[in-house]
Amino acid sequence: MATSAEELREQVRARYAQSARAVAGEGDGCGCGSGACCEGDTDGAGFGEALYAAEQRDELPDAAVLASLGCGNPTAVAQLHEGETVLDLGSGGGIDVILSARRVGSTGTAYGLDMTDEMLALARQNARDAGVTNVHFLKGLIEQIPLPADSVDVVISNCVINLSTDKAAVLAEIGRVLRPGGRLGVSDIVAEDRLTAGERAERGSYVGCIAGALAKAEYEAGLEAAGFEQVTVEFTHRVADGMHGAIVKAVKTPTPAAKGLPVVQPAARAGCC
């Protein structure tokens, strides 16, 4: 019997709640090693805290590092600047939000969005321990981002979009909240185009970040359909046969004015009124 989208979401939520409780000393880990989002033949390699530079890990609370479940380091490729507003989708224990908050400085803001209460509580404590105050953690779904349109300069995410059961909605929401010309910098698991959906599922489970991964061409087409340009998907490391950690980058199509092009105004209507 096929698993429904809601059932998959609950499996993901339960898995990450368990991981948060383990970091907080309240339960067992997910069984995949140090914070790894792993299953199948991945054995945890290419996931977790080891993907961050030692100097980054050293400046973070231990719990933020231990709670890292990602497959990359999106803050390293997002090219954040002081004063920017950045949003992390599926922010988990807050590692990328804390790093982003320091990059954008006191005049910038870093948002973290997560659906799991246990992860949100852990992230808020980690932010307090890190001494960052320009952060806000929001509860919600990445398919329904609780922020206004055109309110964010940069969206990042770390091994989370593959877990969504409605990736088109996620990409559309990213396009909605980004300002024109805003940037996307994501680490995710991406499949080679040669693999069918069934072959991806053979390599690992949905909650293990494998079965739900998009193929490279699917990711590129999805972003272009959502109004992005300068789309690139670059494989960085193998996590299973035909499956890779990848850096996904794109820019929300700027308005004509932002591109330096003339804005054509509608012609005045003839008549007396």
Where do the PLM segments sit?
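Class I SAM-dependent methyltransferase SAM/SAH-binding core
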Residues: 66, 71-74, 81-144, 169
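A short glycine-rich, Lys/Arg-flanked "PGG" loop and its adjoining helix->strand segment in the class I
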Residues: 168-183
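Short, glycine-/aromatic-enriched active-site segment of Class I SAM-dependent methyltransferases
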Residues: 191-210
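Short alpha-helix
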Residues: 211-226
